[in-house]
């Protein structure tokens, strides 16, 4: 199956949108519930091979697509977000090369999905705590570590930390998808124009 630049920008939008919520909750203690569910649901769709299967309707990634739109036009308002995204893309490389960690994450996701099904809510605090703990026990030990800055008052709260880690897990999942779709760092150097056009098509 061949994939297009349109598919790849949707995966990048998934990364950007998850990290936008990381930044938001780290600064304010609050997140967008719909965006969090989109991110968490993508983690559970481990066997999906296209961004449509992973994220559902492209409108679910609208805020992520807008972030990409602004970034490619040097209109981004959060200079930390691209740095976080780069860290996630680098972390994904280490993650997929560590078979033991991949297996642990896969098993943990299965358990969390059963929990979400029982609770009937993928955004339930217990599910986020489960996924956050999974990230802390596995991917967070790989280098480079994704360093999240924010308000110390909120970063000292267990629920906030768990949600941030769950969202980081979702960002890594989107990065894995991006690679599977043929994404590479060269896209940002030589495929920028095509990516801008693809983002505009998805937002149209």
UniProtKB/Swiss-Prot annotation:
GO terms for cellular component: cytoplasm; plasma membrane. Its main location: cytoplasm. Keywords: Cell inner membrane, Cell membrane, Cytoplasm, Membrane. It is found in: Cytoplasm; Cell inner membrane. Transmembrane segments: none annotated. It comes from the Bacteria. Pfam families: DUF489. It is a peripheral membrane protein. NCBIfam families: PRK00218.1-2 (NF001246), PRK00218.1-6 (NF001250). Belongs to the HflD family. This is High frequency lysogenization protein HflD homolog. It comes from Stenotrophomonas maltophilia (strain K279a). The gene is hflD.
């Amino acid at each position: 199956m061949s994939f297009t630049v349109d598919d790849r920008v949707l995966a990048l939008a998934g990364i950007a949108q998850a990290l936008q919520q990381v930044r938001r909750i780290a600064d304010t203690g609050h997140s967008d519930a719909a965006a969090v569910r989109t991110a968490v649901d993508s983690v559970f769709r481990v066997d999906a091979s296209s961004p449509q299967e992973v994220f559902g309707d492209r409108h679910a990634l609208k805020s992520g697509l807008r972030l990409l739109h602004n970034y490619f036009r040097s209109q981004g308002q959060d200079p930390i977000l691209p740095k976080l995204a780069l860290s996630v893309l680098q972390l994904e490389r280490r993650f997929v090369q560590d078979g033991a960690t991949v297996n642990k994450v896969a098993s943990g996701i299965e358990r969390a999905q059963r929990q979400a099904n029982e609770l009937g809510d993928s955004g339930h605090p217990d599910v986020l705590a489960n996924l956050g703990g999974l990230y802390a026990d596995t991917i967070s030990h790989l280098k480079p570590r994704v360093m999240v800055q924010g308000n110390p008052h909120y970063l000292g709260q267990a629920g906030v930390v768990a949600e941030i880690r769950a969202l980081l897990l979702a960002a890594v999942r989107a990065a894995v998808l991006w690679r599977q779709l043929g994404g590479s760092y060269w896209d940002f150097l030589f495929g920028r124009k095509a990516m801008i056009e693809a983002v505009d098509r998805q937002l149209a």
